[in-house]
Amino acid sequence: MQLRRKLARAMGRAITDFDMIADGDRILCAVSGGKDSYAMHALLVDLARRAPVRFSVIAVNIDQGHPGYPGHLLTDYMAAGGHEFRMISEDTYSIVTEKIPENKTYCSLCSRLRRGILYRIARELGCSKIALGHHRDDAVTTLLLNLIFAGQLKSMPPKLISDDGDNIVIRPLIYCAEAELAAFAAEERFPIIPCDLCGSQENLQRKAVSQLLADLDARHPGTRQNMLAALGNVRPSHLFDTGLWKRLGLEVAREEGSARDEAGVGAPAPDVLPVGNLLRNLA
């Protein structure tokens, strides 16, 4: 129960920080059968019962045609709990296996196909938001992947609008630690569906970065949490994006630890922006 409350508080902070849920929302909760999506569904259902705003949750799973897919585990679990649930059958597995060479990871194409299906189903079900189960560790892993392999300073947005403008995607677990979600899933005995049914291997770059983060956190506890905090504590003038400088009206950076910064005298320095302010400035 203590772990459930801790995760609920972290999720609540994310929802509040990024205005993820509004009164009257109908949330499509994408449930893959993994620990994270089960946890997200359980926490959202709890929140819907006690939140000051009224919203509803419908769980959706996509049976993508993987051989031996045990979809009945999810169906039985949702029925036993009396949860609103839809199982959608779409054979994307044959498309992926046809397009992707043997021994290559299917994950990227599979994910894109699944996302497109979710967008369509959300419209059909009248859902105003789509909730995905990405967590803190996903966010910081993506940050490092982009830094190392793409030369970009970005993670995954906690809230985004789809290219077609019809769907808003939210990530309520973005402040939650993967280890705590795993412990919660074990505590609740969720009937987990394995993610390797297709036989595809995890992306090697992501696997390497995940291991790097695990090693760093073992040697320097709090590494992942500090990286998450950094994503919400941005100093644009200490970055090299000239377009960002122009949009924010920056002319020169301030020294670290300047008297103004230390004393907090006067108005906040324009180059010190919590992430919420940054997003509003760029909107």
From Swiss-Prot:
GO terms for molecular function: 4 iron, 4 sulfur cluster binding; ATP binding; metal ion binding; transferase activity; tRNA binding. Its cofactor is Mg(2+); [4Fe-4S] cluster. The keyword Metal-binding applies. It catalyses: cytidine(32) in tRNA + S-sulfanyl-L-cysteinyl-[cysteine desulfurase] + AH2 + ATP = 2-thiocytidine(32) in tRNA + L-cysteinyl-[cysteine desulfurase] + A + AMP + diphosphate + H(+). GO terms for cellular component: cytoplasm. Transmembrane segments: none annotated. Binds 1 [4Fe-4S] cluster per subunit. The cluster is chelated by three Cys residues, the fourth Fe has a free coordination site that may bind a sulfur atom transferred from the persulfide of IscS. It holds the Pfam family ATP_bind_3. Pathway: tRNA modification. It is found in: Cytoplasm. Belongs to the TtcA family. The thiolation reaction likely consists of two steps: a first activation step by ATP to form an adenylated intermediate of the target base of tRNA, and a second nucleophilic substitution step of the sulfur (S) atom supplied by the hydrosulfide attached to the Fe-S cluster. Homodimer. This is tRNA-cytidine(32) 2-sulfurtransferase. It comes from Sorangium cellulosum (strain So ce56).
